[in-house]
């Protein structure tokens, strides 16, 4: 898999002038409202950049590829599997509930909340679509934690939310295979998880319609993807 990286800003651009390629650094991460940045950047070591080692290429979900029947436990403690969503367009994204960075998991959940609202405006379409937020932190994201998080991001404490949007976590042993399939990189680090972003639209036939790497996509794009996939089914 390609090297994993999370982008950080600095308030004082002058702190970057003392850095060079290959430097290891330590810094304070400051998170405030909808923004985050680094302060007190210090060089802790240096190693010349090395070429990437040879290895197998990362798997990238391709349109038309059938998604394996991965299994999870949802926010209600029920076992669910990918296959049971066949017949509906399934929108999938990855999060962990403790993520503090606004541009990462909180953005994915905010975007999915908007998609949930938009699809809900069309009764026929809402019945043909389903949203799935998958945690890659199964040790911490228990069913109760996922349930509380779901109510928070959905803006509702009605269990009816879960009829169209579920929050799930896999068994820890299954997580590497699931993450690899969806090209999700993650690494526990300093009590948090450094990770990439991965979002997919899966057709009613259980095959990939479209895969989005990163977090630059907008809710209307996925709403259109879901609508088009649902209409093709008719």
Where are these regions (language model features)?
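Beta-strand/loop nucleic-acid-binding surfaces
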Residues: 2-15
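Envelope-exposed proteins and targeting segments
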Residues: 4-6, 21-25, 34-37, 66-68, ...
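Solvent-exposed coil/turn segments that connect beta secondary-structure elements
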Residues: 13, 24, 30-32, 43-46, ...
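Short, flexible, surface-exposed loop segments at domain boundaries
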Residues: 16-62
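N-terminal "domain-start" segment that seeds a small globular fold
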Residues: 42-82, 107-117
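Thiol-/selenol-based redox modules, centered on thioredoxin-like
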Residues: 43, 117, 174-234
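Short active-site neighborhood of thiol/selenol oxidoreductases, capturing the structured segment around
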Residues: 80-111, 131-132
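Structural microenvironment flanking redox-active thiols in thiol-disulfide oxidoreductases
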Residues: 107-177
């Amino acid at each position: 898999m390609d090297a994993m990286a999370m982008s950080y800003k600095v308030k004082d651009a002058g702190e970057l002038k003392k850095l060079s390629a290959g430097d290891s650094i330590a810094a304070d991460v400051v998170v405030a409202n909808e923004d985050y940045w680094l302060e007190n950047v210090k060089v802790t070591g240096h190693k010349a950049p090395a070429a990437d080692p040879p290895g197998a290429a990362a798997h990238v979900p391709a349109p038309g590829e059938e998604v394996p029947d991965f299994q999870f436990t949802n926010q209600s403690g029920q076992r669910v599997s990918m296959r049971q969503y066949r017949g509906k367009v399934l929108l999938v994204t990855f999060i962990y509930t403790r993520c503090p960075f606004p541009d990462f998991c909180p953005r994915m959940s905010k975007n999915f909340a908007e998609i949930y609202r938009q699809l809900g405006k069309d009764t026929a379409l809402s019945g043909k679509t389903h949203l799935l937020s998958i945690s890659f932190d199964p040790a911490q994201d228990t069913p109760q934690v996922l349930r509380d998080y779901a109510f928070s991001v959905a803006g509702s404490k009605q269990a009816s939310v879960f009829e169209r949007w579920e929050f799930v976590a896999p068994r820890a042993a299954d997580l590497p295979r699931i993450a690899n399939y969806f090209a999700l990189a993650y690494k526990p680090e300093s009590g948090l998880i450094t990770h990439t972003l991965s979002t997919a639209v899966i057709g009613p036939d259980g095959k990939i319609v479209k895969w989005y790497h990163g977090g630059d996509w907008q809710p209307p794009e996925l709403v259109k993807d879901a609508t088009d996939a649902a209409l093709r089914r008719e």
